[in-house]
Curated annotation (Swiss-Prot):
GO molecular function, one term: peptide-methionine (R)-S-oxide reductase activity
Keywords: Oxidoreductase
Domain MsrB: 5-128
GO biological process, one term: response to oxidative stress
Name of the encoding gene: msrB
Active-site residues (renumbered): 117
InterPro entries (UniProt xref): Met_Sox_Rdtase_MsrB (IPR028427), Met_Sox_Rdtase_MsrB_dom (IPR002579), Mss4-like_sf (IPR011057)
Keyword flag Repeat: no
Record-listed E.C. numbers: 1.8.4.12
Organism, as annotated: Streptococcus agalactiae serotype V (strain ATCC BAA-611 / 2603 V/R)
GO CC term (a single one): cytoplasm
UniProt record similarity statement: Belongs to the MsrB Met sulfoxide reductase family.
Name the record gives this protein: Peptide methionine sulfoxide reductase MsrB
Pfam families named among the record's database cross-references: SelR (PF01641)
Catalysed reactions listed for this entry: L-methionyl-[protein] + [thioredoxin]-disulfide + H2O = L-methionyl-(R)-S-oxide-[protein] + [thioredoxin]-dithiol
Amino acid sequence: MKETQEELRQRIGHTAYQVTQNSATEHAFTGKYDDFFEEGIYVDIVSGEVLFSSLDKFQSGCGWPAFSKPIENRMVTNHQDHSHGMHRIEVRSRQADSHLGHVFNDGPVDAGGLRYCINSAALDFIPYDQMAKRGYGDYLSLFD
């Protein structure tokens, strides 16, 4: 049976629910993955779908976790966002359609020039040494 919205809210918490389901943004420099650089992968907190690797994470100083790319482009979708009087590109997870954050073209040039600015609340981190045990063994080769 599909999880209800209330069950989802209970499972992931209020902030993660607001971010992923209502396109909210957590306050800058408050997310647990902003200044966090352990080896592993980041998955959608709603569905567990694989999104980003620690290998592509960098310190941008923006106050949110920043990645140069998703593990695979097909794992995320991009959408025009004209909210708050700005023009941005929203990033959402493909499977769960969770709001993740935005992508900007001011990232490291040597890594493709993109900066995926992602809310910590939308992510769950899977440490390298737990990837196989938690069902993400197919992605261990990223770290070879």
